[in-house]
Amino acid sequence: MANIKSSEKDIRRTKRRNAANSQNRSRLRTQAKKILKAIKEKDPKAAMALFIEYTSFLDKAAKTNLIHSKNADRKKSRMAKRLNAVSAAA
């Protein structure tokens, strides 16, 4: 346990940040799973609506350094490729 006030504050701040980051990371994973489910069910309209939200989440995560910006770009690109394959087939 920390004995210095600033260290105690650092611990509190770290807990808050960790909780927020965990929540946002979970939201990203959940959104990706929803899109993949819509793609699997061959529902391009629902998948596209979810994809727009997903890209927004990814951009926000990259902006706040939750994930690297190139990681976000790669995830968007791969998901778009899957979405385009379903849209072309439909």
Curated annotation (Swiss-Prot):
For this protein, the parts annotated as crossing the membrane are none
Q: GO biological process: any one?
A: translation
Q: Which SUPFAM superfamilies match?
A: Ribosomal protein S20
Organism superkingdom: Bacteria
Which keywords are on file for this protein? Ribonucleoprotein, Ribosomal protein, RNA-binding, rRNA-binding
Matches recorded under InterPro entries: Ribosomal_bS20, Ribosomal_bS20_sf
- Which molecular function terms from Gene Ontology are attached? small ribosomal subunit rRNA binding; structural constituent of ribosome
**Pfam families associated with the record:** Ribosomal_S20p
Cytoplasm in keyword set:
no
Query: Has the keyword RNA-binding been applied to this entry?
Result: yes
Which intervals carry biased composition (Basic and acidic residues)?
A: 1-11
- Provide a GO CC annotation, any one: small ribosomal subunit
Give the span(s) annotated as Disordered. Answer: 1-29, 69-90
Can you tell me which family this protein belongs to?
A: Belongs to the bacterial ribosomal protein bS20 family.
Function, as annotated: Binds directly to 16S ribosomal RNA.
The name on file for this protein is Small ribosomal subunit protein bS20
Which species is this record about?
A: Leptospira borgpetersenii serovar Hardjo-bovis (strain L550)
Which gene holds the coding sequence for this protein?
A: rpsT
